[in-house]
């Protein structure tokens, strides 16, 4: 898949970042970045690793290998305020900026090569405009990063026989640091191009907590100063078809490895049935369980552990980008382990360690007849009992039996004869009554 990225100057604001740097940040195979600045009297030192290309390649576990062609900068015909000033709480004409940018690069770009499915429409165009953006501190005349459709705005743009319709855009500079922005906003907006909706409350008037820093579709693009967005969650990968969660039904002692490394997650359905189709789920209500650790793209998450998400899919909400606009029925809802749902950004909107298990709690009994108990974490692996689990360790050894020796699955004799003192795993226990396999 191939996409076009256009760098845009205004008549009064021009790019200060080299095109080569923007190209490396979006497409580089070994991109790194280090910088520091003072904020509220304190020095902030930022280190980041990974380009936008690397982010999508990693988040898709190699299923998605995008090619971003970076063109420009080109200069549109008006100043920034012409396109970005607020009119009835909306930017005046960002779509005009996008159309002009496409027309300006038409002589050097063959738009046909960006219609990957040959449906007559360019699959996506992304514009990075010079200067600041309104979402991260720019004034009211700057443009708010967003994705939209030219045709929806009444704009027709046909180049090389292809319509340019779906687009996204974001700003060059971060007003807080006076350095160029990281990949966070680009990855967020480009995720819309891929079909994913926002998971924050999109009216701008909500005061309740959504999924926050745990997701690229909410506050996550700002993790590590916008340089290290969180990896796609289990739900986001499931929606894209990049992950197939395992439906768990029977009582089980669950061992769940870290999401990025294992590409594995679990799904609970109240009916114990599910079609396992992420973008057309049936039943529409289900739960996803994933192991999030502060490694790789998740290094700057608020915590680590078992993440439990309740999904209540509604086609209209997904299509209208209003997934979490109802606090009473959010479409993708983080189940906070500690039961604390902050009411505003001032007390934990972005997320906290207690959102996940076992930091916030060691059990969740909120799904009728589908208990999650004895949640623990060891060496980055999550363990818990589902629906009561199955008898393990000393529960499987009768009290009248005496343990003679314990071997691991490789046949290596263990020094201990106390099962509970051993790490989680599978063992063969030799007792005075015989031998048996034990799951610890």
Model region roles, listed by residue range:
Residues 6-11, 128-132, 169, 196-197, ...:
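Active-site-proximal beta-strand/loop segments in catalytic clefts of secreted hydrolases
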Residues 127, 184-199, 289:
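Active-site recognition of the HExxH zinc-binding catalytic motif
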Residues 132-146, 202, 225-226:
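Secretory-pathway/luminal and periplasmic proteins that interact with or process carbohydrate-rich
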Residues 391-440:
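C-terminal outer-membrane/trafficking sorting elements
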Residues 1-28, 85-90, 131:
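Fold-level signature of zinc-dependent metallopeptidase catalytic domains
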């Amino acid at each position: 898949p191939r996409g076009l990225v256009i760098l845009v100057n205004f008549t009064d604001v021009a790019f200060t970042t080299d095109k080569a740097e923007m190209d490396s940040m979006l497409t580089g195979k070994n991109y790194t970045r280090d910088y520091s600045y003072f904020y509220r009297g304190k020095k902030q030192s930022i280190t980041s690793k990974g380009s936008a290309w690397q982010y999508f390649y990693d988040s898709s576990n190699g299923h998605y290998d995008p090619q971003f062609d970076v063109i420009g900068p080109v200069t549109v015909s008006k100043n920034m305020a012409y396109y970005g000033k607020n009119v009835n709480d909306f930017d005046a004409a960002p779509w005009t900026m996008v159309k002009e940018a496409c027309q300006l690069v038409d002589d050097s770009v063959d738009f046909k090569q960006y219609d990957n499915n040959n449906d007559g429409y360019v699959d996506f165009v992304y514009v990075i405009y010079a200067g600041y953006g309104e979402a991260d501190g720019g004034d009211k005349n700057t443009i708010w990063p967003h994705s939209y459709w030219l045709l929806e705005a009444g704009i027709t743009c046909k180049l090389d026989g292809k319509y340019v319709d779906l687009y996204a855009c974001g700003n060059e500079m971060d007003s807080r640091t006076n350095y160029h922005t990281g990949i966070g906003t680009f990855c967020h907006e480009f995720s819309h191009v891929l079909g994913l909706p926002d998971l924050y409350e999109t009216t701008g008037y909500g005061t309740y907590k959504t999924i926050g820093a745990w997701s690229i579709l909410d506050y996550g693009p700002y993790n590590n100063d916008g340089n290290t967005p969180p990896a796609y969650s289990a739900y986001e990968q499931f929606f894209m078809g990049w992950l197939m969660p395992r439906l768990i039904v029977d009582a089980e002692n669950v061992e769940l490895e870290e999401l990025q490394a294992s590409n594995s997650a679990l799904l609970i359905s109240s009916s114990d049935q599910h079609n396992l189709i992420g973008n057309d789920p049936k039943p529409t209500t289900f739960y996803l369980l994933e192991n999030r650790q502060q490694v790789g793209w998740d290094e700057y998450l608020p915590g680590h552990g078992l993440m439990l998400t309740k999904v209540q899919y509604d086609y209209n909400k997904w299509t209208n980008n209003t997934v979490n606009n109802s606090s009473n029925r959010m479409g993708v809802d983080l189940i906070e382990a500690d039961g604390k749902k902050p009411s505003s950004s001032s007390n934990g909107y972005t997320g906290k360690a207690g959102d996940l298990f076992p930091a916030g709690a060691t059990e969740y009994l909120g799904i009728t007849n589908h208990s999650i108990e004895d949640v623990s974490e060891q060496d980055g692996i999550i363990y818990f009992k589902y629906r009561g689990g199955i008898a393990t360790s000393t529960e499987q050894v009768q009290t009248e039996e005496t343990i003679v020796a314990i071997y691991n699955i490789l046949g290596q004799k263990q020094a201990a004869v106390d099962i509970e003192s051993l790490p989680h795993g599978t063992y063969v226990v030799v007792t005075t009554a015989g031998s048996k396999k034990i799951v610890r």
